[in-house]
Amino acid sequence: MLNDILVEVAEKTQLLESLIIPHERALTESDYSDQLENIRAEISATLNSLSNLNDLLISHDGPLRTEISSLMASKSKLKKINMKELTLLNEQETLETLRNDSSNLESSRPGFTTQQQQSITIASSYRHELQKYLDLVDVEKTSLNTNKLADNSKISKEDVENSDFNFNLKRYEKQQSILHSALTVNEIEIKKLETLLKEFRKDNNFIRDELKLINSNLKSHEDLISDELKQIDESRYAIMQSIGYSGRNEQQSSILDSIVKLSIKKPDIRTLIQERIEEYSNLLNFIDMKLNGLDQMLQEYKSRKSEWAEKSILWSQCLALISELEVTVRDQLSSAHTVGSEISPDQIKAQIKKFLTKLNKLLDESDLEDVVYSLVRNEVNSLNVALDEMNQMPQIKNDISDRESIHNPSFKLISKSPPKTGFSSENVSYKLNNTNIKKD
């Protein structure tokens, strides 16, 4: 909307400037005199439009203030999404670190420190019984020696008849008792170890399940971060479009693309963060520049408010004086017609001089030196030329018929010179024919 109004202001200003020559031509050349009133009306309408447009621009809810408010809102939003984006990128960096740490743990598992270790004491009392057995029996005579076991697998009749057999039975009995005791304790301790191993396996499964859960949560969090970064990227791009920022490199990937590429190219995410900080800084500087420009424009159009009022007043007063002069001369001609008396050119010249004085006073009191001043000066120059021509005229004799009615009489010079009185065809006129004045 702001651009449309500024374009309209420029077009109206150009139109006003373009009316200077047609206005002067309508005042000085008979071929264009019939356009004078239309040109004057167009000048008035253009001045009124420019004044209204200026008021619209500086109004409380006008486009300038609206644009300033919009830029301030964009600046505030950019600051918020900048902080949010940098936070998300730092989180993304943390996730990247966690992924790297997880990969390193798979390939190299560091040992635990002493403080991290939890000692588990395992009792092994069956070995005491086992050692007693080994002390009684030579290792060579145990099952560890497979050859000896094969040799002793059978007992001969001679062994039974041997006097030492009973002694050996008692020895076997003792050995058997020791082994039963060791076996009982051993099986109990195995059950304890199996229970401990079962707990270890349960812990192992729990740890694996927790790792899966954590990795799943990390993946979900990473996906959420990526989605938020994408939304931020879209919001930033929308703001850039709305403020007319063209500094965005179209070749540059979006944040989401950059994050996705982290897993491929493995760039330093710190570099990406620095790029975002720089980009936001450029955006904020651009907004500040626009805000400064709009603020200067607002102050400029505020100062123009009184200027446009002065221009409109000057032009309106000029037209009012011209109209008053035309009415005065028309009334004089009408009065002369009514009484059938003669009218002296000096009377008309006196009125022209009187109104020229008023018009010149308007120009002298005005500080304007622009288009409107030139337009009023055209009117003044036209009256001056008319006055000079009237000074060169012979005496005029009233020759108006009583049967003729006065209907918008106008001044016209029927001579070699074009009309230069500044009076339009809708206003007072006189006809020079030696010494006679006739109503058209």
UniProtKB/Swiss-Prot annotation:
Entry annotated with the keyword Iron-sulfur: no
One GO term describing the cellular component: membrane
One BP term from GO: autophagy
Cysteine disulfide partners in this protein: none
Keyword match Protein transport: yes
Keywords assigned by UniProt, alphabetized: Autophagy, Coiled coil, Cytoplasm, Membrane, Protein transport, Transport
Coiled coil location: 32-108, 183-234, 274-311
Membrane topology classification: Peripheral membrane protein
Subcellular location: Cytoplasm; Membrane
Functional description taken from the UniProt entry: Required for cytoplasm to vacuole transport (Cvt) vesicle formation and efficient autophagy. Plays a role in ATG protein retrieval from the pre-autophagosomal structure (PAS) and is especially required for autophagy-dependent cycling of ATG9. Also plays a role in regulation of filamentous growth.
Family in the record: Belongs to the ATG23 family.
Protein name as annotated: Autophagy-related protein 23
Annotated source species: Candida glabrata (strain ATCC 2001 / BCRC 20586 / JCM 3761 / NBRC 0622 / NRRL Y-65 / CBS 138) (Yeast)
